[in-house]
Structure formats: C-alpha cells, structure tokens
Amino acid sequence: MSRTLKSNEPEDLAFARSFAAEGPRSQAAAGLVFFWAGLLYGLQTLTYGVVEAGGFALSASQGLALAIAPTVPFLAIVGFVGWRDRKAKKGVVTRTLNASYTSAGLINLIIALIFGWLATSRQSMVIWLLHPIVICAMQGAVWYAACAIRRKLWLGLVSAGWFVTTVALTLLITHITGYLLVLGAALLGLMAAPGFMMMRLAAREQGRE
C-alpha cells in the first residue's frame, strides 16, 4: 500500500505544480472566450426575445445581420486566443481543461448539425429549440468538470445554474418569448459573467506572483 502511494506521489506533485503555474493563464484565456461568447450571443438572443414579444420588427436584411453579427467578432477572439497561446507550454491542468472544452465544442457542433437537419426536414421549430436545451446541459457538465478539477464552489454554482436553465427551457419550449429571454439571460449570467470573473481572478493570481 505504501509502495503504491509513493509511486503516485510524483504525479500528484506534478499536477499541483502545473495547477499553480498554469492555472491563471488557462483561466484567463478561457474567461476571455466565455465572456465574449456569453455577451455577444446573450445580447443576440435577448434581442430575438424582444422582437418575438412585439417590441420592434426586423427587416429581412436586419434579421440576417443580427443572425451573423456575433459570429465574426467571436471567431476573431477565438483566433486571437489561439494565436497568442500557440507556443505556450501546456501541462496536465491546461490539457485536461482544454480537452473538456474541445470535446464539448465538438459535441455541440455535431448536435447542431443533427438538430438543424431534423428541424429542416421535418419543418419543425420545436426540434430546433431542443438544440439549445442540450447545449445548456452540456455547459452544466463542462462547468461541473471545471469545478471538480479546480475545486471552486462558484464553478459548481454556475454548473447548477446551467442545469436549472435546461429544465426551464424545457418547460418554456412552447412559449418562444419566455424561452428566448431565459436563454439570453443565462448566456449573460452563466457565461459572460463567469468569464469576466475568471479573467479577474486570473489577473489577481498573476499579480501575486
């Protein structure tokens, strides 16, 4: 038994050193992406909710602009983060979190294609509205993984918020206005706000070094 513990000791120490050294850097990068994703797509979704509620109308060109507006700056931000960190050495913590985020992103892409094809072929908006519900559940799982790795209570609260949002959207799936407003609020409160907090915490930790 003692031999097993001794054999595991170097790996545990390596993980701890990697966590201390790379935590702020990986947290800042992820926070930047989450902040802008939540802000851009949250405002877009809330705008759709206001339109659906009859607040104002959009022309065809305005609707197209609103549909694609968040994507261009968001891709630019992702490209910037990838380019900035391209030569950075990645330890076990960064690789673990990156694998979690990347896996969720790939699953989200595949799910979007599947639900998009089904919604188009069946001419059913309800099928397409199931897509964000699944994405919210995935977000809950990703934030739970981050909570388990970093052992931070607030990450667990964000995870719980996403799971609550999943249930709320399921109940509102036939009430489009409420559905869009709740989803938009979740993107701002459970993605943009935590992303901003991650950047602030990373800056504070780096300032102590």
What are these regions (language model features)?
Residues I77-R95, A141-A148, A192-M199:
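C-terminal ends of transmembrane helices
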Residues V142-E209:
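Terminal transmembrane helical module of multi-pass membrane proteins
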Residues M1-A30:
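N-terminal juxtamembrane cytosolic/stromal segments of multi-pass membrane proteins
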Residues T96-L155:
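Membrane-proximal helix-loop-helix units in multi-pass membrane proteins
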Residues Q44-G49, I107-A119, V142-A145, W162-H175:
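Hydrophobic alpha-helical transmembrane segments and adjacent interfacial helices
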Residues G31-F34, G38, T71, L106, ...:
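Residues within membrane-spanning alpha-helices of integral membrane proteins
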Residues R25-I114:
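Selected alpha-helical membrane-embedding segments in polytopic membrane proteins
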Residues G49-S61, G116-L129, L172-G178:
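Helix-coil boundary and interhelical linker segments in multi-pass alpha-helical membrane proteins
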